[in-house]
């Protein structure tokens, strides 16, 4: 499997060498093979798959197989698009991927790989699906199957296309900035002292000794978490709960000010994510399976997005004249891997613009895509607003920083922990491109090159919102020293 991740779906640095003309439908020249339950209408260019209820089905995807010219996919990002209509599709296998969809069945050499688009069950009218995927290497064997996986019922597919595209199109803002754009900062923000601190929940400070501890640690900033735990989906009570927590933070502000500790406030996004991802997040490769289910609902739901913006407006009104609150940190670790109504940057832009109508000066922090990753700075765009700070989180390599979590401490108990520095798995953009490398201080430095390039190009201020290593990892002190040196 890891060979496929390296050779089939992977590094986007190779995506500028186009062998297919822009706009060409790569399926037009594909070999089309209808299966037992699938038909292809060449005149209307429509796929129909119908599996009667009661039919014995398996995990195989039954339908119509398209076998394109694989050479045209090599080293490209390809946008797949189609419209799907379903009639009483029932999941028989019971998994969330047992449905009607497009399945990409790929391989390099003898290493198989499957990846599915958004799937559908039940009865649905025509719905458009757009899906972008990068392909790496020149030894690709790929087939696209439009059909039903471990499911029965009827599905139709039309307007079927696959075309080479801009790999970062789905993540960009619509407006263009001047070629010589530079970020604008007030002197107070540009000349602010270097901030050093920790992340904490607001209720930690119900214990007054927490302030003493931070003073001993020489902390001058806290990235402070607010928001109701486990209530992200309760629309009716969310705003009232945030008002209560804003009031509590307001009560704490005099003590923060007295201790010389600034607050960067952030809060749990209303609506949450489509799934509850594990704790791995920025740890790259081990977060790969979370994928699109880790996207926030505000990327698709206008109702939740409006609430998200409204709460930030309330925060600006409450804290614009509060010196202890230094910045608004808008969105914690966004994850966007597919087309959305509003992409990860657009939702932050909406909130930032709303804040600026109320508070013109206090810094606003923008997070990079894919868990605040450092590599996604290669397509991050600056906002044309004053005092915008750009944030990353970094737990790389994740197999070292988060060791013991995925395997239930197996390697630790066996006395075979992952050490630093050492040769480990390293994953690239969107955790798709896999290599095995020796990771030391110089390799860590290489991780941050996209951030440095962004900083120099736009004159941006950068904030390292999170980085650390799990406490039982050997050589953790050396790792942290290298990260900050």
Please tell me what each predicted stretch does.
Residues 71-73, 137, 213, 317-319, ...:
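Surface-exposed acidic, glycine-flexible loop patches that form ligand/cofactor-binding
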Residues 177-363, 368-377, 385-387, 483:
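Active-site mouth of glycoside hydrolases
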Residues 21-183:
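Extracellular and organelle-lumenal recognition/adhesion modules and their flexible linkers in secreted
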Residues 197, 310-313, 317-320, 324, ...:
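Extracellular glycoside hydrolase catalytic/binding regions
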Residues 87, 109, 125, 229-231, ...:
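Active-site loop signature of alpha/beta-hydrolase-fold enzymes
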Residues 1-9:
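Bacterial N-terminal signal peptides that target proteins for export
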């Amino acid at each position: 499997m890891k060979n496929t991740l390296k050779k089939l779906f992977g590094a986007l640095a190779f995506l500028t060498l186009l062998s297919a003309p822009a706009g060409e439908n790569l399926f037009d020249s594909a070999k089309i093979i209808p299966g037992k339950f699938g038909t292809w209408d060449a005149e209307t260019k429509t796929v129909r798959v119908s599996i009667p209820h009661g039919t014995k089905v398996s995990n195989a995807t039954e339908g119509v197989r398209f076998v394109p010219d694989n050479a045209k996919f090599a080293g490209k990002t390809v946008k797949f698009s189609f419209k799907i209509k379903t009639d009483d599709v029932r999941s028989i296998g019971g998994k969330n991927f047992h449905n009607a969809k497009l399945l990409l069945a790929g391989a390099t050499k003898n290493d198989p790989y499957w990846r599915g688009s958004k799937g559908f069950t039940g009865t649905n009218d025509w719905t458009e699906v757009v899906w972008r995927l990068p392909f790496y290497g020149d030894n690709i064997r790929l087939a696209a199957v439009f059909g039903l996986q471990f499911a029965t019922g009827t599905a139709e597919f039309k307007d079927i296309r696959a075309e080479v595209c801009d790999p970062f199109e789905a993540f960009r803002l619509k407006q263009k900035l001047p070629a010589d754009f530079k970020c604008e900062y007030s002197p107070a923000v540009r000349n602010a002292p270097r901030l050093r601190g920790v992340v904490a929940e607001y209720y930690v400070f119900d214990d007054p000794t927490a302030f003493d501890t931070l003073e001993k640690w020489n902390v001058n900033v806290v990235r402070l978490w607010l928001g109701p735990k486990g209530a992200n989906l309760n629309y009716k009570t969310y705003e009232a709960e945030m008002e209560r927590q804003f009031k509590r933070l307001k009560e704490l502000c005099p003590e923060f000010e007295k201790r010389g500790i600034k607050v960067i406030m952030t809060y749990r996004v209303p609506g949450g994510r489509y799934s509850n991802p594990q704790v791995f997040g920025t740890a790259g490769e081990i977060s790969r399976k979370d994928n699109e289910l880790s996207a926030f609902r505000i990327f698709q739901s206008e109702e939740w997005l409006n609430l998200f913006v409204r709460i930030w407006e309330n925060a600006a009104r409450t804290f614009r004249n509060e010196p202890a609150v230094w910045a608004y940190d808008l969105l914690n670790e966004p994850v966007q891997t597919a087309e959305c109504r509003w992409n990860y940057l657009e939702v932050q832009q909406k909130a930032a613009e709303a804040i600026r109508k109320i508070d013109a000066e206090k810094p606003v922090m923008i997070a990079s895509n894919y868990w605040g990753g450092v590599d996604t700075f290669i397509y991050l765009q600056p906002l044309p607003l004053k005092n915008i700070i750009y944030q990353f989180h970094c737990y790389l390599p994740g197999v070292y920083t988060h060791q013991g979590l995925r395997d239930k401490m197996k390697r630790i108990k066996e006395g075979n922990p992952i050490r630093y520095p050492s040769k480990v798995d390293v994953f690239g953009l969107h955790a798709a491109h896999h290599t095995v490398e020796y990771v030391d201080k110089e390799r860590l430095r290489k991780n941050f090159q996209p951030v440095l390039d962004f900083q120099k190009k736009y004159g941006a201020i950068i904030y390292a919102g999170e980085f650390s290593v799990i406490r039982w990892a050997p050589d953790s002190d050396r790792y942290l020293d290298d990260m900050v040196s």
